[in-house]
Every structure is written in structure tokens, then in C-alpha cells.
């Protein structure tokens, strides 16, 4: 089991006693109880009983500022050491022997790489702890799909707060458009409007031309009709004048005869 491997590979004696005390505090289940725990619970059980140093008073009234936290390397056991011991114990169990901590630390990256080969990526200590924590959170939280209807969803996308409401699966999305695309769309709309305006102008012009042509045709027909009526009236007047003519008799005048006069004596 994991706990037994950690206890076997750990060199300090107080760590083994802490693990035994923590296992006894869990109900006396022995190795079965420790086997079901993860690295976080083991570390929490180990460092839970460590005393915190008291802060001395300055002048009897105010406490001194807290001391800086000890370095991770100066701690008795760190999470990386426990992880290396676990992976080293796994290598030793596979080889049939016990591997010292130094060899376990050297073999830890290879074991981690082998464990992550099944998924196509290497697994680190942070990934392992995050996966274990995510499993526990998924087991603790139960989500209800029907309860998510009509609730307000808030989140942060690229540093900007996004707020939206779920309304029966329908949502209105406003897409941001590139300025060049917007300008091209405006030019296209303007071109369409210009074409529509030109088409309307052509239609009005054609209608006006057709109206003028019809008016000219009507005037030509009326003019021809008036000329015909005028000619008919002239012919009728001439005929009436011929019928109502007055006969005129012209007498022939006789020529004056020359005769001898007695105006002069010889």
C-alpha cells in the first residue's frame, strides 16, 4: 500500500510515528485506512500536530511582527520529498527491492513520465494533486441541470467581466466586427442604395418619356383631324358658291364712226 511504502522509504523516525498516530486517530483501520488516503491527507496528518512558535511581546503591550515563514527546503518533509518517496517505492516494488531516497528521487521523473505516457503527456506533482482534489470536489458537489435555468451566469473572460442570463436556450449574441469589414459592408450597402436609386430614376424617366410620346401621338392625330375638317369645309363652300352664281349679261358697245365736220371752210 501507499502508506506502507512511504513509511518504509522514509528515513526520519518521527515521520513513521506521525503516520502511525494519524492512522490510529483515523479509527485503527491500519493499512486499509491509509491506503484509501491521498497525498494531501497524509501531509495534513503529518503537519497538523506541529506547534506554532509563540510571538514575544515588545514592551509588554504589542506583539512583535510575525517571523518570516521557514524555507521549504528547511522543513522536515516537503510534498516533493513525499512524492519522490512514493514514486521511488513504486519503482522498488516493481524491481522487487527497496530503493534509498536518493535513488528514488532520481527515478521519480522517469516513473512520472511512464505514468503519463498512457495519456500522451507527463504528469507532475501539481497535476497529481490537482487531479486528486478535482475528484474529491466532483464527489462532494452535485449539480442539478434543472436548477441552472433562468440563473445569471457570471465569469471573467480575458480580464473582462461577462454577465449573461439563460432564458430557455435562446440567447442574443452581439458579434464584434472588424473596422475594415464594417467599412466594406457600408460601401456595399451604399452601392446597393445607389443602384436602387438609379433604377428608380430610370423608371421615372421611362414613364415620363412614355407619357410624352403618348401626348405627341394624340396631338398629331388631333391636328390631322382638324386639317381634314378644314379642307372639307373649303370644298363645301366652293361648291355652294358655284351653285348660287348670278348670270351677268354684258352688252357689246358699237364703235364710233368717223364723219366729216364743217368746222372749217376752204
Curated annotation (Swiss-Prot):
Region feature Basic motif, mapped onto this chain: 187-205
Every bZIP domain range: 184-248
Principal location class: nucleus
Segments for region (Leucine-zipper): 212-219
Disruption of the gene: reported phenotype: No visible phenotype under normal growth conditions, but mutant plants exhibit increased sensitivity to salt and drought stresses.
InterPro entries for the chain: bZIP (IPR004827), BZIP46-like (IPR043452), bZIP_sf (IPR046347)
Record GO terms (molecular function): DNA-binding transcription factor activity; sequence-specific DNA binding
Name of the protein described by the UniProt record: bZIP transcription factor 12
Gene name of the record: BZIP12
